[in-house]
UniProtKB/Swiss-Prot annotation:
It is found in: Cell membrane. Signal peptide: none annotated. Gene3D superfamilies: Spore Coat Polysaccharide Biosynthesis Protein SpsA, Chain A. The keyword Hydrolase does not apply. This is Chitin synthase 7. The gene is CHS7.
Length: 699
C-alpha cells in the first residue's frame, strides 16, 4: 500500500469527523466558559471578602479547580473515539496513564455519590405512602402553619392549592393556612378566592386579615401592601408570631411550611414531614428544616416537559438525597420547605432581610435574588449546630407546573444557573462550612470540576451510529458507570413512584447536555454582556422614589430580569432612608451592602428550644422572666415606642419597628357579619362538614 493510500481517510471517518468536530468545538467552548465563569465568581468573592479565610480559600479553590480542569481536558481528548489517523499521534504511554487516571476519577466521583444515595434510600422510605401507623388527633399531632403567598395567580389554581392542603390526611384542627395576598386591593382574585372559602361578597369592605373555617381547617386570609414575595412572607411571619405567642411558651411542636400558590400537596405530605421532624421512633426532635420532593405537572405534554419531569425526579431524589446523606441539602426551595418555628424565629430577621437593597453589583444580585433559596440555605447551614439537621424528606411530595415554552424554560434556567454558580463560590470559600460539613463541601467541589463533560457521551453514541468505531473500541467502563448507575436508579424511582416515563432517562442523558450547554452559554454571555458592556439605556433603576423590588419587577415585566442596575440599589435605599429619617439600618441587619457569607453572629443560632422544669420552652440565651411574662414583641400603637424586650435580638420585634405594624390579629369572619349572613354561613359550614367523609383517622 502506498503512502498516499495510507493517508486517505475512509468515508465514514470523514463524515464522523466533520460532525463530531462541531460538537467538540462546542464542548471546548463549554469547558472554557465554565472555568472562566467559576474563576470570575471566585475573584468577586476574593474582592468582597470580609475575612482573611475567605481570601485564602478563594485562592486555594481557584488553583485546585484550575489544576483539575486542566488535567481533565487532555483526559477528555484521549478518551474520545477519534479516527485512527488522529489517535496514532498520541503517545501510547501517555494515553494509558491519562485514561487510567480519568476512569478511576470519574468512577469515584460518580460511584461515591451513588452509594450515598443508595444508603439514604435504604434508611429512609421513598414514595407517597403514609408512614404514621397510630391515630393522629389534635392532641398527638403537631400544629402546622402553611404560608402561601399569592400574587396575580389564577383563582382556580389558588383554590386548588388550598384544597390540596386542607384535604391532607392530617387532623384539620392542627392545620392553619395563612393565605397572604401581595397587594392590599380587594381585586377580582381576592374576592373570588374568599367567595370560594365561604365568605359572603355582600360586605362593603373586608378587614386586612380574616379568619375563616374551611373544611374544618383554619384559614387566615390577609392582604399586605405590595412588596414582593419575601416581603409578603415576612409580614405573614409577624402575624403568625403574634397569633401563636402564648402557644409557643409551653410548646415546641409548631412547624411552618412555605409553599407556592400553584403547588399541589400530596395527601400524605404533611404527616410524612411531621413524622421525620417530630414523630418517628427515637426522634431527638432536633430536626430544623426539611424539603420534600417536588415533581412537575403539565397541561400538555411535549419534549421539554418530559425532560423537565425526568430532571425534577433525578435532581430531587438523587442529587438532594446525596447532599442529605453528606450532612445537609444545599438548597431549600421556597416551593416546599418545612421548618421548626421556634428555631426559625431566631433566624427570621436575617432570613427576611431585604437582600436586594444590599446588592452592589450583578454578582450580589445573582447571589441574593436569583439564587435566594441557596443563599438562605447557606444561612441555615451556618446557623445549625451540627450536621443532619437540614435534610430531605423522600416521602413528602408536591406538584408544580413545569415551564411550558422554550422561552420561559431558558429564562428559568438562566436564573438557576446564575444563582447556582455565585452561591457555589460563596459556599466553597466559607471555612465554617468546610469545618462542619467537610464531606458535603468536598463532594460539591469535586462535582464542579467534572461539570460540562456530558457532551462527550453524545460523541461516543455518534461514533457507533456512523460506524466509525465499534463498541469494543469505546470506553465501555466510563459509559457503564456514568449512564448505567443513574439509569438503574431512575428505573427504581419510576417503578416506586409509578412515573414510568422517567425510564426514558437515556434519552435525557443524550439530549439534555445540549440544553444545558445552551443554558450555560446563554446565561454567561447575557450576564457577561451586562457586566462588561453595562446596562441598556432602558434598564430599570432604583432611586429615592423607586425601591429595588420595584426595579426588579419592572425588568421582569419587560421580559429581561437582568436588565437592571443593581449598582444603584444601595445608594437608592440610603437616599430613601435619609428622606424618611429612618437611619441606615440596612434592611434590619445594620449594614449597607451585601456580604459574601452570613455573619458570624448567626453561627449556631438555628436551634430548637429546650423544655425547663416549669413547663416553659426556652433557648439557653433567653430570659425565662420574659417568656413567663409572655413578651414576644407585640406591635405598639402608631407613634409610640416599643418597650425594651430581653429577647429583642431573637424575635420579630425588629420588624414592626422597621416595617410597620403587620402583626394585627385577624378578625373572625362571624364578627363582621350581620345576623342573616351569619346564619347562612353556619348552614354552609354544617353542609360542608357533612360532605366530608370523616372516618376514624388511622394514619
Amino acid at each position: 500500500m502506498s503512502d498516499d493510500e495510507r493517508d486517505d481517510w475512509p468515508v465514514q471517518d470523514i463524515v464522523y469527523t466533520s460532525i463530531v468536530g462541531v460538537v467538540m468545538l462546542a464542548a471546548v467552548l463549554e469547558w472554557f466558559l465554565w472555568i472562566a465563569a467559576f474563576l470570575y465568581c471566585l475573584w468577586k468573592v476574593f474582592v468582597k471578602a470580609e475575612h482573611w479565610t475567605i481570601r485564602v480559600l478563594s485562592v486555594v479553590v481557584a488553583l485546585l479547580f484550575t489544576a483539575l480542569r486542566s488535567i481533565f481536558l487532555p483526559i477528555m481528548v484521549v478518551t474520545l473515539p477519534l479516527p485512527a489517523a488522529v489517535v496514532e499521534v498520541w503517545p501510547p504511554g501517555m494515553v494509558e496513564v491519562l485514561q487510567w487516571f480519568g476512569f478511576w476519577c470519574f468512577a469515584g466521583l460518580l460511584t461515591v455519590p451513588w452509594l450515598f444515595c443508595i444508603y439514604q434510600l435504604v434508611t429512609n422510605q421513598l414514595g407517597r405512602t403514609k408512614r404514621i401507623k397510630q391515630v393522629l388527633d389534635e392532641v398527638s399531632a403537631p400544629k402546622v402553619v402553611i404560608v402561601m403567598p399569592c400574587y396575580k395567580e389564577e383563582p382556580d389554581i389558588l383554590v386548588k392549592a388550598v384544597d390540596s392542603v386542607v384535604d391532607c390526611d392530617y387532623p384539620p384542627s392542627c392545620i392553619h393556612v395563612f393565605l397572604s395576598f401581595d397587594g392590599d386591593q380587594e381585586d377580582e382574585l381576592y374576592l373570588r378566592t374568599i367567595e370560594s372559602l365561604g365568605i359572603s361578597l355582600t360586605l362593603e369592605s373586608y378587614p386586612k386579615s380574616i379568619d375563616v373555617t374551611y373544611k374544618e381547617a383554619r384559614i387566615t386570609v390577609s392582604r399586605f401592601p405590595h412588596g414582593g414575595k419575601r416581603h409578603c412572607q415576612k409580614a405573614t411571619f409577624e402575624l403568625i408570631d403574634k397569633v401563636y405567642r402564648h402557644y409557643l411558651q409551653r410548646n415546641d411542636n409548631l412547624f411552618i411550611l412555605f409553599i407556592d400558590s400553584d403547588c399541589i400537596l400530596d395527601r400524605h405530605c404533611l404527616q410524612n414531614f411531621v413524622y421525620d421532624m417530630e414523630l418517628s421512633p427515637g426522634n431527638r426532635r432536633d430536626m430544623l428544616a426539611m424539603t420534600g420532593v417536588i415533581t412537575s405537572t403539565t397541561r400538555k405534554h411535549s419534549l421539554i416537559t418530559i425532560l423537565q419531569d425526568m430532571e425534577y425526579v433525578h435532581g430531587q431524589l438523587f442529587e438532594r438525597t446525596v447532599e442529605s446523606g453528606c450532612g445537609s441539602v444545599t438548597c431549600l426551595p421556597g416551593a416546599l420547605t418545612m421548618l421548626r418555628f421556634s428555631a426559625f424565629r431566631r433566624m427570621a430577621k436575617y432570613y427576611f432581610a431585604d437582600k436586594a437593597e444590599q446588592c452592589d453589583d450583578l454578582f450580589d444580585f445573582a447571589k441574593c435574588h436569583l439564587g435566594e433559596d441557596r443563599w438562605l440555605t447557606h444561612l441555615f447551614m451556618i446557623g445549625a449546630k451540627k450536621r443532619y439537621q437540614i435534610q430531605m424528606c423522600t416521602s413528602a411530595f408536591c406538584k408544580t407546573e413545569a415551564a411550558q415554552t422554550t422561552k420561559s424554560l431558558i429564562k428559568q434556567r438562566r436564573r438557576w444557573f446564575l444563582g447556582f454558580i455565585t452561591n457555589e463560590a460563596c459556599m466553597l470559600t466559607d471555612w465554617r462550612l468546610w469545618k462542619r460539613y467537610p464531606v458535603l463541601i468536598f463532594v460539591r467541589f469535586m462535582q464542579n470540576t467534572i461539570r460540562t463533560t456530558a457532551l462527550l457521551f453524545f460523541i461516543m453514541v455518534l461514533a457507533i451510529i456512523t460506524t466509525s468505531k465499534k463498541v469494543d473500541q469505546l470506553p465501555v467502563g466510563f459509559i457503564a458507570v456514568s449512564l448505567g448507575l443513574n439509569w438503574l436508579l431512575m428505573i427504581y424511582f419510576g417503578a416506586k413512584l409509578k412515573r414510568f416515563k422517567v425510564w426514558l432517562y437515556p434519552v435525557m442523558f443524550v439530549v439534555n447536555p445540549f440544553f444545558n450547554w445552551f443554558y450555560m452559554v446563554y446565561g454567561i454571555f447575557t450576564a457577561g454582556q451586562r457586566t462588561w458592556g453595562g446596562p441598556r439605556a432602558d434598564a430599570a433603576e432604583a432611586s429615592s422614589g423607586a425601591t429595588a423590588q420595584e426595579a426588579i419587577e419592572q425588568a421582569e415585566k419587560a421580559g429581561d430580569d437582568l436588565n437592571i442596575v443593581p449598582e444603584m440599589f444601595v445608594r437608592a435605599a440610603a437616599a430613601r432612608r435619609r428622606s424618611l429619617n429612618k437611619g441606615n439600618q440596612g434592611g434590619g441587619l445594620g449594614r449597607k451592602t451585601s456580604v459574601v457569607r452570613p455573619p458570624d453572629k448567626i453561627d449556631g443560632r438555628f436551634t430548637a428550644r429546650n423544655q425547663l422544669h416549669g413547663g416553659f420552652f426556652t433557648h439557653g440565651d433567653e430570659s425565662l422572666d420574659s417568656i413567663a411574662a409572655g413578651g414576644s414583641g407585640e406591635a405598639s400603637e402608631p407613634g409610640t415606642r416599643w418597650a425594651p424586650d430581653p429577647r429583642e435580638s431573637f424575635d420579630s420585634t425588629l420588624y414592626s419597628q422597621t416595617y410597620g405594624n403587620y402583626g394585627v390579629p385577624p378578625r373572625r369572619l362571624e364578627s363582621i357579619m350581620d345576623d342573616e349572613d351569619r346564619k347562612k354561613f353556619e348552614l354552609a359550614q354544617q353542609s360542608q362538614s357533612y360532605t366530608i367523609l370523616r372516618p376514624a383517622r388511622i394514619v
